[in-house]
Regions:
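Long extracytoplasmic/lumenal interhelical loops at the membrane interface
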Residues: 294-361, 373, 377-380
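Transmembrane alpha-helices of multi-pass inner-membrane enzymes
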Residues: 55-63, 386-395, 404-438
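Alpha-helical transmembrane segments of multi-pass inner-membrane proteins
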Residues: 38, 131-156, 166-247, 253-266
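Membrane-interface helix-loop-helix junctions at transmembrane boundaries of multi-pass membrane enzymes
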Residues: 17, 21-28, 60-75, 218-235, ...
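A juxtamembrane structural motif centered on a specific transmembrane helix
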Residues: 1-29, 65-68, 288-291, 415-438
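Hydrophobic transmembrane alpha-helices and their immediate junctions
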Residues: 229-233, 240, 257-261, 265, ...
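A membrane-periplasm/extracellular boundary helix in multi-pass inner-membrane enzymes
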Residues: 143-155, 264-303
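N-terminal hydrophobic segments of proteins, predominantly signal-anchor/transmembrane helices
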Residues: 30-42, 56-119, 143-144, 379, ...
Length: 438
């Protein structure tokens, strides 16, 4: 019997979407490169610029889009970005323009990531792919942490460092950005201790990244894979706790503790698999602290409050600087007054950075946008509920850590994916086909 011509036409029609899907998948190639190839960026000395570099193809895609959707409340963030530009007029030295440009480029790259993910089709960016990206960077973070524990004095000259002009490469700020080191060796406990920092510029960046990525690995994968694949994440989590504890990042542990308590209080939202993952995590931490020398190390850190007075001084001076220029700030962190051994005012927490650099108005806009994200992610389904938890972590971390690199981009990435998932579900429910079927 002869084939129906209608059936004959279906074969090429089915092939066309597959070819189209392959073309669309290429649009996210730079994010694949960033998350799965982050160690390469680190070796090349480009890790501090990875987000900006990978945002360029994403921006190109957005520019070519006929329509770019923007979620409600995004105007607050755009106003914050505009206020940042006004603050550049307050810079007191031309050299400060380098730091300002670097920080502003990170704000812009996070914005591009958010808009790209929010507008990407489901076939291109399913939740599984977003969570896989975060898991890959988390594994890299843990591996770098172990490198810092095992070889604390390790480091090497990066590819970028080799080609930079010597005058630029010797600049301390540039050195921090382009020279890979395994750990920051400090002696505040009375003996040298390597606090992991690889593959980031500072140990605080390592702690901030670990705190923001761990909930995604635990909760995101718990929802996607159920109980079948929980053994591997739990084994990796067990291994990660050693460099996490050795890092002595109190802000990291505070953030994770708040996340754990908050998620437990919202257990109905996070789901049964996530509750099991959270409980297993808590048990692992307690056991490690109780039966290994890591418990003694954590106790020594708690007993040694060496940094409390320094941070109090920096926070007090941040408020003082903000009072001198309450509207536009100073455009950049400022030199500390008095104790010259302390880092610049505005470098020990995102909120203090914004306050000193962009004044009370900038700080208000920044916090307002985080609260907008908190509101908009509060009632997400279990599969994307981790987005809300990341906003909570960011609200805690902003007082102690710089969020410009990994934390901002991960929060924007996961929140954008969650809000896009929520929007698609709402569109599906309100579509004529769905209504007619009902």
């Amino acid at each position: 019997m002869a084939r129906s011509p209608v059936l004959d036409r279906r074969a090429p029609a089915a092939a066309a979407p597959r070819r189209s899907r392959r073309r669309r998948l290429r649009l996210g190639w730079s994010l694949d490169l960033l998350f799965f190839g982050y160690p390469l960026f680190w070796v090349l000395g480009l890790h501090s610029f990875a987000w900006q570099l990978c945002a360029v193809p994403l921006l190109g895609h957005l520019v070519l889009q006929r329509r770019v959707r923007v979620p409600r409340g995004m105007g607050v963030w755009f106003t914050f970005l505009a206020w940042n530009l006004l603050s550049v007029t307050q810079l007191q030295r031309s050299a400060q323009l380098i730091g300002f440009s670097y920080r502003y480029s990170l704000y812009l790259s996070a914005t591009v990531v958010f808009l790209f993910v929010y507008n990407a089709p489901t076939a291109l960016l399913p939740l599984r792919r977003v969570y896989s990206w975060c898991a890959a960077l988390w594994i890299t973070t843990v591996a770098g942490g172990w490198l810092g524990v095992m070889v604390p004095n390790g480091g090497f000259t990066s590819g970028l460092e080799r080609v930079l002009p010597s005058r630029l490469a010797e600049d301390l700020f540039v050195q921090d950005l382009v020279h890979p080191s395994f750990a920051q060796v400090q002696q505040f406990l009375g003996y040298p201790l390597g606090r992991p920092q690889a593959p980031f510029a500072y140990t605080n960046h390592w702690g901030a990244a670990f705190a923001i990525l761990t909930p995604v690995v635990l909760l995101g994968w718990a929802h996607l894979n159920g109980s079948r694949y929980q053994l591997a994440p739990q084994l990796l989590l067990t291994a990660s706790l050693v460099p996490a504890i050795v890092s002595l990042n109190r802000g990291m542990f505070l953030s994770l503790l708040v996340a754990l308590v908050y998620a437990s209080a919202r257990s109905g939202r996070v789901g049964a698999n996530a509750r099991r993952a959270l409980l297993a995590t808590l048990v692992l931490v307690v056991v490690l602290l109780a039966v290994t020398p890591l418990g003694n190390l954590a106790q020594e850190r708690n007993d040694n409050q060496h940094s409390n007075s320094g941070r109090a001084t920096l926070y007090g001076q941040a408020l003082d600087y903000a009072g001198r220029s309450p509207f536009l700030g100073f455009g950049a962190p400022q030199e500390v007054e008095g104790d010259l051994l302390l880092p610049p005012v505005g470098t020990q927490g995102q909120i203090w950075l914004v306050l000193v650099s962009h004044g009370y108005v900038g700080a208000l806009l920044y916090v307002a946008f985080l609260l907008v994200l908190f509101r908009d992610t509060r009632r997400l389904p279990a599969r994307t509920s981790v987005a809300h938890l990341l906003v909570v972590v960011a609200l805690v971390e902003m007082f102690v850590y710089d969020l410009l690199t990994v934390p901002h981009h991960i929060v924007f990435l996961v929140v954008a994916a969650a809000l896009a998932d929520k929007r698609r579900a709402a569109d599906l429910e309100s579509s004529p086909t769905t209504s007619g079927a009902a």
